[in-house]
């Protein structure tokens, strides 16, 4: 780790950020997006903290994709064409587009605006930097490495004993780069059913130990949010499914259903898409109810659910994951994306509850700027202007 820098590689980002960036290049190359930070716990910060953040964000501009990383991406992220990684070699983060401020009560506000295929790459580095700088500044405690290893030993034992397949989804709210590195190495060496990491850098780093280790991920809510902003929410899910399939040809075939509620998604989940996609990801609401609905949908199309999969990724720990696996055993294939419980279970602090979501989208500079909305299967996880949220619910027949 270089002088406490929070992010040390252009590939220290979630895989789906690169896949979505290329999707935007293909579908809305002139689209302009604004991502906005939300602290769900309403933490209060100081100007000193803001100044430290600005210093860290300036360091992002020094990152560049190396020749070695380019070759690895070409060989391992084969579903994104070489031309994208050639573009990425020339891409640099621009700290000037990251606007940071405190309101009168000390709440933190961060926004970033640019062409959407560029600005989507900012979200995860910003979140992980806020998290790491927070622990350095306010907690000023070192991770309890003995505690971390003790927790990992229990989690790995549970996974190995129950053949529980999981990936690390934990960069955004991690304690630090150092902790995620340590956790990933431990899992790589000891967890038989650890299948990979959403953080591309660590998948690359530890593939030398485990050649089967993979970068993991598909898409995020922002795709449906951006699409709905310019064409309305009724068919946004189907539009994304169709265009994603055209671009990736069946690769990265896990759909995210809950952006406008799973109830709405199931209306859009046509027979052809149900057959084409490998499965879906659960990210809000009751996981057992969700899985039952997905299985019922497949069965209504006479598709054997055991040929499909669900990736569960909503605030999981290993005990919860095991309960889900047992419930769906023999009914549908399952795997798990576990984040904060891996990368911020350090024995000394509580994880922050922070997100950064698409606030507005403009399909090109000549068009209107639309406000974006995310609904959810969990009450209270909705994001967007309250009037716009209400409008979406009316349009979608949810109220």
Residue ranges and their predicted role:
Residues 1-236, 240, 245-246, 357-399:
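Ordered alpha/beta subdomains of enzyme catalytic regions
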């Amino acid at each position: 780790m270089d002088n406490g820098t929070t992010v040390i590689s252009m590939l220290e980002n979630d895989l789906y950020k690169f896949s979505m960036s290329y999707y935007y290049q293909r579908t809305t190359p002139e689209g302009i997006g604004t991502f906005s930070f939300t602290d769900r716990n309403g933490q209060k910060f100081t100007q000193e903290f803001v100044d430290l953040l600005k210093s860290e964000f300036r360091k992002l501009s020094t990152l560049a994709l190396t020749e070695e990383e380019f070759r690895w991406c070409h060989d391992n992220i084969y579903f994104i064409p070489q031309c994208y990684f050639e573009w990425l070699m020339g891409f640099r983060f621009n700290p000037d587009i990251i606007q940071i401020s405190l309101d009168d009560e000390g709440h933190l506000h961060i926004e970033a605006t640019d062409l959407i295929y560029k600005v989507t790459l900012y979200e995860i580095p910003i979140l992980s930097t806020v998290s790491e700088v927070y622990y350095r500044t306010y907690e000023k405690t070192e991770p309890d490495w003995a505690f971390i290893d003790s927790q990992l030993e229990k989690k790995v034992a549970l996974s190995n004993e129950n053949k529980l397949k999981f990936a690390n989804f934990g960069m955004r709210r991690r304690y630090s780069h150092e902790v995620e590195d340590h956790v990933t190495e431990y899992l790589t060496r000891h967890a038989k059913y650890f299948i990979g990491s959403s953080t591309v850098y660590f998948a690359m780093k530890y593939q030398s130990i485990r050649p089967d280790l993979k970068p993991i991920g598909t898409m995020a809510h922002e795709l449906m949010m951006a699409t709905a902003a310019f064409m309305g929410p009724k068919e946004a899910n189907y539009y994304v499914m169709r265009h994603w399939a055209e671009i990736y040809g069946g690769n990265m075939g896990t759909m995210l259903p809950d952006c406008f509620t799973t109830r709405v998604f199931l209306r859009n989940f046509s027979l052809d898409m149900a057959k084409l996609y490998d499965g879906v990801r659960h990210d809000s609401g009751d996981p057992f109810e969700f899985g039952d609905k997905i299985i019922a949908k497949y069965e209504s199309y006479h598709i054997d659910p055991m040929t499909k999969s669900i990736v569960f990724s909503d605030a999981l720990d290993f005990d919860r994951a095991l309960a889900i696996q047992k419930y769906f055993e023999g009914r549908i294939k399952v795997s798990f994306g576990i984040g904060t419980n891996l990368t911020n279970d350090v024995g000394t602090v509580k994880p922050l509850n922070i997100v950064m979501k698409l606030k507005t989208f403009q399909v090109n500079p000549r068009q209107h700027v639309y406000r974006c909305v995310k609904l959810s299967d969990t009450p209270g996880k909705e994001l967007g202007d309250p009037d716009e949220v209400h409008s979406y619910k009316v349009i979608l027949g949810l109220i």
